[in-house]
Amino acid sequence: MDATFKSTIPSCNLKKNYYNQSMKLNELPKTIPIFPLSNFIMFPGTTVPLNIFEPRYLQMVNDAMKKHRMIGMIQPKKTGVLKKPDLYEIGCIGKITSFNETEDGRILIILNGICRFKVNSEINSEKLYRECEVQYNYFSNDISKKSNEVNFSDLNIIMENMKKFFKKQGYIVNLKDLDKEDLSKTLNDLSMASPFSLEEKQILLECLDVNIRKEKMELILNNYIKDEFENKTLQ
């Protein structure tokens, strides 16, 4: 593993982390350092602590701190070479909001998800870490005020099914803190916190808008509930 992480999302309380409304799409860097961390997908508006210890990613964080303090989190595929696996096309850029160096040479950071990106191409570089040219046009709603309109009238079933699913998977999560947050932020929190497979989370990450993500999440949850019902019936 290149870093360890402990997301603040699947804990006893889902804490608020609002979007950075002061940032505009054209202010996001077009060339970004890429952190292909296995078994982890970050969503816009979520927060994750990272423990950085591998030399290439120590260099990456230090370089980012000298510039825009932003890092692109992306899921590596199972294809490609070990040191340079193929990447999914869609990831999420995050901003370092906390930075601490430890006595043993590690760096502890807090990364706040800002906006999803699509990889255009990878840059040949002499740096230890990977860099990519990216675009954000498909995901402008991630940082627009329009994406933060409160509308929970159609989330009741999802919330109830998610509670059942969390309990079935052995998670103890308090979803009450989500009641006053916007729809997109809530769906992103649930997507990141859920015990869904990485492939399912990647599907949710790639949904262009809130309604599509809501429909996909309903479908995923319904499939799990259906499988559980069929298993009980067979027994």
Model-derived segments and their meaning:
Residues 12, 18-173, 199, 203, ...:
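Positively charged
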Residues 178-196:
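Core structural elements
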Residues 191, 202-205:
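Amphipathic alpha-helical segments within well-ordered protein domains
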Residues 6-8, 13:
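N-terminal polybasic/positive-inside topogenic patches
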Residues 180-183, 206-210:
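Small/polar glycine-rich anion-binding or flexible loop at a beta-alpha turn
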